[in-house]
């Protein structure tokens, strides 16, 4: 009888660095909200939430880098212990609705597992929106959905 082995292989996408001198940046439309994500219904019928932040960046931008850019324009988010819960809002062409997918969490003043995740690794596509739930340090950190492993 032969022995059979089973191996679980986690596929990690290659980080493709972008030559930022030669590559045109994309317009990242970011919507921040305190304590919660915006409702997906706020993105329907050509509408978007009113508090838009426009950032020109590249697909290799990390969540840590995006956190820094949001902190630069929003002084309230600079306090140590502030959580940034990132989600991509993207169109679902099958049912003509938008869907939201959480992609990571960063925290001001703390290193985290998602800090170096890039937009490309999060499968961000040009035209998607970025929705950020900002949780101040005096509140509980955002609850993470269980990852389907």
Predicted features by range, described:
Residues 2-149:
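Ubiquitin system architectures
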